[in-house]
Swiss-Prot record:
One cellular component term from this protein's GO annotations in UniProt: cytosol
SMART domains named among the record's database cross-references: Aamy
Protein name (Swiss-Prot/TrEMBL): 1,4-alpha-glucan branching enzyme GlgB 1
Annotated active site: D513 (nucleophile), E566 (proton donor)
Native organism: Streptomyces avermitilis (strain ATCC 31267 / DSM 46492 / JCM 5070 / NBRC 14893 / NCIMB 12804 / NRRL 8165 / MA-4680)
Gene: glgB1
InterPro entries: A-amylase/branching_C, Branching_enzy, GlgB, GlgB_N, GlgB_N_E_set_prok, Glyco_hydro_13_cat_dom, Glyco_hydro_13_N, Glyco_hydro_b
Biological role: Catalyzes the formation of the alpha-1,6-glucosidic linkages in glycogen by scission of a 1,4-alpha-linked oligosaccharide from growing alpha-1,4-glucan chains and the subsequent attachment of the oligosaccharide to the alpha-1,6 position.
Biological classification of the source: Bacteria, Bacillati, Actinomycetota, Actinomycetes, Kitasatosporales
Pathway this chain belongs to: Glycan biosynthesis; glycogen biosynthesis
C-alpha cells in the first residue's frame, strides 16, 4: 500500500481509466528539498553507526563493503541534490511507524547503509512497467539471485526511500528515479524480507507483493483454458487468503487481449502504477497477490488495450460491489453460517413437476421500498408463507446499474445488488425464506449485458464476452450485447455463474430470461441484419450447446434445484432431457396460455363466445413441455394495467372475473406464478419506484374488504391446491386431465376433471358469464357417490355474491358429456368452483 495523496479523488475511476494522483512538488519545494540534502557529508560517527547497522552476520570483508557503500553515498549526496519526488499524505490503513518530519526521515536514511547499486532495471522493462504493459513484472521486481548476490528492485512512486529489512540486515536501496529503487546485496539466497518505504511524513512497512509465487494453481488454469472450471468464482476475482504464510488478497482477471493489467483501489489510492499483474502463460489470466489487503477494500482493474489506451474496469467475477451509481468492486469473503439444513436435505425428495409449485413473483427493491435484505427477511417469508405459496421468484438480484431495468441488464453477475445490503445479508434473506418453508427462485439473465464502459463490453479492448461478429453481438431490442456462447471461456463464465447462485446462495431454481432471443439468430432482426449458422439455418447452435451444458451441470451438481425457461416460441424439447437432445430445462413458462387466456377474459362476457377457443387451445399442447402458467411482472406494466383492471365491467365484475380467472388458472395443468400486488387486486399497474399499493389493505380504507377478499381467495387457492394431489401430481401426464365440457360456447362455461396418481378426481367448473346458471348438468364418473364443493370463488368472504352449493351433490343416472352419470350444479356468476369426492 502507498500513503493517501492530498486529494482522494475517485470521481474519474470509470471509463478510460484516467485518474488524479498526488500533487507534485512545486519548484520552490524542489529547491528546498535540494537545499536540505546538498552539502551534507557523513561524519565519522555516522559512518561508524551505519557500518554497525549493516549486515552484522557477514564477514569482515562484507562489513567493509557496506561501510564503503555508505561513505560513497554520503560523498555523492554532498554534491548531487536529492531528486524531488511527488508527495503523498498519510494512509489511514497503512501499517506505519510514527510520522516524523521529512528532515528526520532523511537523517535516519543516512544512518542506514545503502546497498551497492545492482544492474538497473532495463530501459525496456522500465518503460513497460511505467506504461502498464509488462506481462511479467515479477521477473523484474522483487528479489532475484544474480551473480554477486541478490538483486532487489522495487517500484514505489512518490517514495523518498525504500529499505530492505530482514532478521539480519537493514539496507536502503538506491533511488534510480521515476519510483524505482534497486540494490545488490551480497547474499547467497533470497531471504524473507519486508520493505520500509519512507514517504513524506511517514514510514510504511509492508511485504513486497513481487516476492510471491503465483497464488493460482496449474489445475485452475487448465480448467479455465478448457472452459470447464465449474467453480470459477474460486479462481477469478478477488480472493482473501493466506499465501506463503502472509495474509492478503489474490486478484485475478481473464483479459487475453490486454497488453497489460494493473490493480487500482483504495489500498493504493487508485494509482495502479506500482501494482502490475503478471500474465499466467497462455491462459489469458492475470494475477497478483497483494499482501495486507483484506475484506472491504474497493478495487478495479486498469487494462491497457491493444491500441495502448487504458480502461478502468470492474471485476467481472466480483462477489460484492458498491451500490449504484458507484461502480467499484469490493473484496469480499463470506462468513455466513446457514441454518436451513432441514430444507436443503429435503429439497430433492420429489421431482418438482410432481410436486405442488405455486410461485409469488417479487421485485425486492419495490416490494417494501427502502427495506434491506435483512429487513425484508423479517416480513417477506411470513407474508408468503401465510398466503400458502411454495416459492418466491425474485426478479434479477445480480448487480445492475440502472434500477429501471428491474435487474435485467446485469453488470455484476456474481454479486447480489448492493442496494439492499451485502452478499451475506442476501444469504440471510434466503435462509429466512427456507426456514419459513418457502423455496427461492431467481431470475437469471445470460442472454445479454449492457454496454457500460466500466463493465463487460469490449472488456480488454476487443470483443471478449460479446461476439466478434457485429450481427451477432448487438441485441436489437434492448441496445445491449449478446454473449459469445461459442467461446469456451465465456460459456464457462455463465455456466459457473448458474452453479454459483445455487451452491453459494442456496437458490432453489433459476428462471432463465429471454431464452427465445438466445435460440434464434434472426430474433427481432430483419433480412440482412443477421448471419446464419454453419448449416445456413437461423438456430444459434452455440446458444443451444450452452443451455444444454448449463442445465446438465446445474442438475448434476445441485440436486433438487429446477431451471425454468422463459421461452415464447414453439422450440421443441425445451424441457426434454439433454441426453434426448433437449435443452434440459425442468419447466417452461407457458406464454401461449397466458396471452390466450388474458385475451379471453378481457372481452365483454357477451363477446366471449367468439373467443371460447382461447381458453381451451392450451390443452392441445399442454403436455408437450412441463409448463408454468405465468401472470408475471411483464403483464402489469407499460400501459397493460394490473390484472384486475384488465377485466371488463364495474368494480364488482372486475374482481369477480379476476377471482374466477385465478380459480381456473390454479386448476389448469401446470404450475402457477403470480406477480406481487395482484394477490389483493391492486388497481394500478406496477412501478418499480413505489411497488404495491399496500394502503389498499389498510382497515381504515373503505374498500379494504374488497382487496382483503381477493387476498383471502389466493390464500385458500394455495391451501386447497397443496392438499389436493389431483391438482399437481400428474401435471405432466395426459392421464391427469379430462374435459367434461370444453365446448359450452354459448354458456361461457368450462369444466374438466383432474386426477391424482391414485385416481382421485377433482372437478373444476368455471362460469365466465355474469348470470347464475341453475341446475347446470355436467357429466361425471358413476363411481363417485357424492361431490362436495371445496372452493367457490363467489364466496362472501372473498367479496362475492355467495351463490354456493352447500350440500353434497349426488350423481344421477343420466348420461351427459359422454359419461354414464351427471350432477346438477348452481353456477354462480363469474366464478370457478372446485368439487371433490365427498
Amino acid at each position: 500500500m502507498i500513503p493517501r495523496p492530498p486529494s482522494d479523488d475517485r470521481a474519474n475511476q470509470n471509463g478510460d481509466g484516467s485518474k488524479k494522483t498526488g500533487a507534485k512538488k512545486t519548484g520552490a519545494k524542489k529547491a528546498a528539498a535540494a537545499k536540505k540534502t546538498a552539502g551534507k557529508k557523513a561524519t565519522p560517527a555516522a559512518k561508524a553507526t551505519a557500518a554497525k547497522g549493516a549486515v552484522t552476520k557477514k564477514t569482515g570483508k562484507g562489513k567493509a563493503t557496506a561501510k564503503k557503500a555508505v561513505a560513497d553515498k554520503a560523498a555523492a549526496k554532498a554534491t548531487v541534490p536529492q531528486q524531488a519526488v511527488p508527495k503523498q499524505a498519510v494512509s489511514k490503513r497503512a501499517v506505519s511507524k510514527k510520522a516524523v518530519p521529512r528532515k528526520a526521515v532523511v537523517k535516519a536514511a543516512l544512518d542506514i547503509p545503502e546497498a551497492p547499486v545492482s544492474p538497473a532495471v532495463a530501459p525496456d522493462d522500465r518503460d513497460r512497467l511505467l506504461s502498464g504493459t509488462h506481462h511479467a513484472p515479477h521477473s523484474v521486481l522483487g528479489a532475484h539471485p544474480v551473480p554477486g548476490g541478490v538483486a532487489f528492485r522495487v517500484l514505489r512512486p512518490y517514495a523518498l526511500s525504500v529499505t530492505v529489512v530482514t532478521d539480519d540486515l537493514r539496507t536502503e536501496l538506491h533511488d534510480d528515479g521515476a519510483g524505482f529503487f534497486t540494490g545488490l546485496l551480497p547474499l547467497r539466497a533470497v531471504p524473507d524480507y519486508r520493505l520500509h518505504v519512507a514517504y513524506e511524513g511517514t514510514v510504511h512497512e509492508t511485504e513486497d507483493a513481487y516476492r510471491f509465487l503465483p497464488a493460482l494453481g496449474e489445475l485452475d488454469l487448465h480448467l479455465i483454458n478448457e472452459g470447464r472450471h465449474e467453480e470459477l468464482w474460486t479462481a477469478l476475482g478477488a480472493e482473501p487468503m493466506t499465501h506463503q504464510g502472509v495474509p492478503g488478497t489474490r486478484f485475478t482477471v481473464w483479459a487475453p487481449n490486454a497488453r497489460g493489467v494493473r490493480l487500482a483501489g483504495t489500498f493504493n489510492f487508485w494509482d495502479a502504477t506500482a501494482f502490475p499483474l503478471r500474465s499466467l502463460g497462455s491462459s489469458g489470466v492475470w494475477e497478483l497477490f497483494v499482501p495486507g489487503v483484506g475484506e472491504g477494500e474497493l478495487y478495479k482493474f486498469e487494462i491497457t488495450r491493444p491500441d495502448g489506451s487504458k480502461t478502468l474496469r470492474a471485476d467481472p467475477v466480483a462477489r460484492r460491489t458498491e451500490a449504484p451509481p458507484r461502480t467499484s468492486s469490493i473484496v469480499h469473503a463470506s462468513h455466513y453460517a446457514w441454518a436451513d439444513e432441514a430444507w436443503m436435505a429435503a429439497r430433492g425428495e420429489r421431482p418438482v413437476h410432481e410436486s405442488p409449485f405455486s410461485v409469488y413473483e417479487v421485485h425486492l427493491p419495490s416490494w417494501r421500498p427502502g427495506l434491506t435484505y435483512r429487513q425484508l427477511a423479517e416480513q417477506l417469508p411470513a407474508y408468503v408463507a401465510d398466503l400458502g405459496f411454495t416459492h418466491v421468484e425474485l426478479l434479477p438480484v445480480a448487480e445492475h446499474p440502472f434500477g429501471g431495468s428491474w435487474g435485467y441488464q446485469v453488470t455484476g453477475f456474481y454479486a447480489p445488488t448492493a442496494r439492499l445490503g451485502t452478499p451475506d445479508d442476501f444469504k440471510y434473506l434466503v435462509d429466512a425464506l427456507h426456514r419459513a418453508g418457502v423455496g427461492v427462485l431467481m431470475d437469471w439473465v445470460p442472454a445479454h449485458f449492457p454496454r457500460d464502459d466500466w463493465a463487460l463490453a469490449e472488456f480488454d479492448g476487443r470483443p471478449l464476452y460479446e461476439h466478434e461478429d457485429p450481427l451477432r453481438a448487438a441485441h436489437p431490442d434492448w441496445g445491449t450485447l449478446e454473449f459469445d456462447y461459442g467461446r469456451r471461456e465465456v460459456r464457462n463464465f455463465l455456466v459457473a455463474n448458474a452453479v454459483y447462485w445455487c451452491e453459494e446462495f442456496h437458490i432453489d431454481g433459476l428462471r432463465v430470461d429471454a431464452v427465445a432471443s438466445m435460440l434464434y439468430l434472426d430474433y427481432s432482426r430483419e433480412e440482412g441484419q443477421w448471419s446464419p449458422n454453419e448449416f445456413g439455418g437461423r438456430e444459434n447452435l452455440d446458444a443451444v450447446a450452452f443451455l444444454q451444458e448449463m442445465n446438465a451441470t446445474v442438475y448434476r451438481r445441485v440436486p433438487g434445484v429446477v431451471t425454468i425457461a422463459e421461452e415464447s416460441t414453439a422450440w421443441e424439447g425445451v424441457t426434454r432431457a439433454t441426453h434426448d437432445n433437449g435443452l434440459g430445462f425442468g419447466l417452461k413458462w407457458n406464454m401461449g396460455w397466458m396471452h390466450d387466456s388474458l385475451g379471453y377474459v378481457q372481452h365483454e362476457p357477451v363477446h366471449r363466445r367468439f373467443h371460447h377457443h382461447e381458453m381451451t387451445f392450451s390443452m392441445v399442447y399442454a403436455y408437450s413441455e412441463n409448463y408454468v402458467l405465468p401472470i408475471s411482472h411483464d403483464e402489469v406494466v407499460h400501459g397493460k394495467g394490473s390484472l384486475v383492471s384488465k377485466m371488463p365491467g364495474d368494480w364488482w365484475q372486475q374482481r369477480a372475473t379476476e377471482r374466477a380467472y385465478l380459480g381456473f388458472m390454479w386448476a389448469h395443468p401446470g404450475k402457477q406464478l403470480l406477480f406481487m400486488g395482484q394477490e389483493f387486486a391492486q388497481g394500478a399497474e406496477w412501478s418499480e419506484t413505489h411497488g404495491p399499493d399496500w394502503w389498499l389493505l389498510d382497515p381504515a380504507y373503505g374498500a379494504e374488504p374488497d382487496h382483503r377478499g381477493m387476498r383471502d381467495l389466493v390464500r385458500d387457492l394455495n391451501t386447497v391446491y397443496r392438499h389436493e394431489p389431483a391438482l399437481w401430481e400428474r401435471d405432466t401426464d395426459p392421464s391427469g386431465f379430462a374435459w367434461v365440457t370444453g365446448d359450452a360456447v354459448e354458456d361461457n362455461v368450462f369444466a374438466f376433471l383432474r386426477h391424482a396418481a391414485d385416481g382421485t378426481p377433482l372437478l373444476a367448473v368455471s362460469n365466465f358469464s355474469p348470470v347464475v346458471r341453475h341446475d347446470y348438468r355436467l357429466g361425471v364418473p358413476d363411481d363417485i357417490p357424492a361431490w362436495h364443493e371445496t372452493l367457490n370463488t363467489d364466496g362472501a368472504r372473498y367479496g362475492g355474491s355467495d351463490v354456493t352449493n352447500p350440500h353434497p351433490v349426488k350423481p344421477e343416472p343420466q348420461g351427459r358429456h359422454g359419461r354414464p352419470a351427471s350432477i346438477r350444479l348452481t353456477l354462480p356468476p363469474l366464478s370457478t368452483l372446485w368439487l371433490r369426492p365427498a
